Amino acid sequence: MGPISKIYFLNNPYPNGHKIVTFNWSGRIDEYGFIWFDFHLKTENYYANDDENDEEEDEDLPDWNSKIVWGNYHTCTLSSNYWGEQRGIRINNLDEKLDFDTIIKNDLFSNDLPSEHHFDDDDLAFSIYLLGHDSCAGHQISFSKKDNNRYDITWTGKIALTYAGDDEFSHDFKAEIFNVEFEGFHYPKTWSPEKATEMFRARLANFEEYEFVDLNPKSNKREYKLDKLKQ
């Protein structure tokens, strides 16, 4: 059994972190030819492995430090696409073809940490449900390639407890995710396979190393994604 994927919210009441039960890493090309990475994670219950009695907790503790408050919200979802928005981190420029292997050799940065307290949540690369619908920014994501097209991912960022009215990105998280497989590139549903082929061929280096995969072979409705050929 390999290492367990976890996310740590620094200085919260659970120093051993929280197990990640769902993690997805995919790509997407939009109508304009920009290519994005999407990430989605969900944790188990915050208190899943906590056997300590917290009935004597200080009522004056800040929300971040209170097990009772964390227990009220149960789990975390951190995602660029779970709530239907088109967020994520853009990984290409239109004037050059995207080389997947080159991209993942370097850290990704969301470059969305607001410079002032008043910010538009729609400008952020990811949404987060933590202690309510809070805000996160300043993401840095790094990849370590393993065998069989698998990767280990380290993901850090900043959190503001905006659900409680705090716009300061004063909290930090770190996620360590192991043995992850890239799930391929999606494209707009309005595109035909021919249009998708044309757009991907123009935007991706080494296009011959990819293939279109049926998302649901058992369905009468044909939908595809572009995935790397299995080596």
Model-derived features with residue positions:
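Flexible, membrane-facing loop/turn or short amphipathic-helix motifs
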Residues: 129-130, 160-166
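Short amphipathic beta-strand and strand-loop transition segments with alternating hydrophobic
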Residues: 17-28, 137-145, 158
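Short secondary-structure subsegments characteristic of cysteine-rich extracellular domains
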Residues: 164-187
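Polar/acidic, low-complexity leader/linker segments enriched in S/T/G and N/D
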Residues: 1-56
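A short, structured loop/turn motif at beta-sheet edges
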Residues: 142-152, 179-181
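Surface-exposed helix/loop patches within compact recognition domains
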Residues: 35-142
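Generic short beta-strand segments
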Residues: 42-44, 154-160
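Intrinsically disordered, low-complexity terminal/linker regions enriched in Pro/Ser/Gly
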Residues: 187-231
